[in-house]
Amino acid sequence: MKYSNKESHITPRFERRFFGGDNFLTLNIESSNDVLRWIDWTTARLPFRICTVRILKAIKDIMALFRGNFPGYFACDTRYHDLAHTLRLFPPFCQIAIALFRKHPATILSMELELGLLTILLHDSGYIRKEGDCNGTGAKYTFHHIDRSVDFARTYLPSLGYQEQDLLNVEHMIRCTGIKPKLKQINFTSEGYRLLGYALGTADLLSQMSDPHYLRKLSLLFSELEEAYSYAGPNQLGKMEVQRFKSYRDLIQHTPFFFKKVAGKCLQNMGAVYRLLENPETGLNPYLKRVQENMKGITQRSIPHNCYRYPLGQANRRVILTPNSMAGGFHHVL
């Protein structure tokens, strides 16, 4: 694989957008160097350093994987679970992880945080098809993508020098993601990995449901589910007890119930670490606030008629990485 050593000249800029008008740092996700600089800036106040060499290599490799430049794999062809979807986990995960460290400084260690960051990059790699898999898209693996992500992580991470124990810890954290993670079946090797696994699962839910374009993107999610339904077949769906939505409008109408009964329960079961995202001065959780606004848009039927078609273009190459207004979360002990 050929990677450009040219340093990105894209300058991060603050823009007023979403989350009640709070400021967010917006970075171009086309640049692995920009993403690494953001991680380095975020974790700079911790008393230890992570291995940025391996993190940068992983960022470049996963970007190559999603773009079809990784040996043995096709490009990502799932329009909902894309590269931007993966990178959106960094802000809430990092804020929760740093808050956890400030509460339990002896629990969150350098290697644990490093593997947590790597797990973000790897957690949806199971959607990527291998070369020779020419039927359909990666969406067909929706109900099996976690196992496939674990398999990819176990194959890939040794190339960065990680050992079997590291692979096991990454597997445990990957299994904290998804709609209904079986948390009680995960034998975490340390309290730190358990907490970071919960941080990852929490970030996975909140980062997508708080997306300002979430309601529009549900049509893309339904397209993925539709292919997954067909690939699994009715018998397998029955065994998995998977709810089948009749249309994307049906999916949208069930979303408030999903957030309240399924996602809400999941967030509580993961140690309620979502509370660490609250602003210490106002008590406002900007992620939950945006999720609630999205749910309100559904229940009040204030969704524009044409919102179901999500436009692809320049906006998809940018991702909101961190809110300036939440920087206080990096300084205080919650």
Language-model features and meaning:
Residues 63-91, 132-139:
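Active-site flanking loop/helix segments enriched in acidic
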Residues 86, 93, 145-183, 232, ...:
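Histidine- and acidic-residue-rich, metal-dependent catalytic cores
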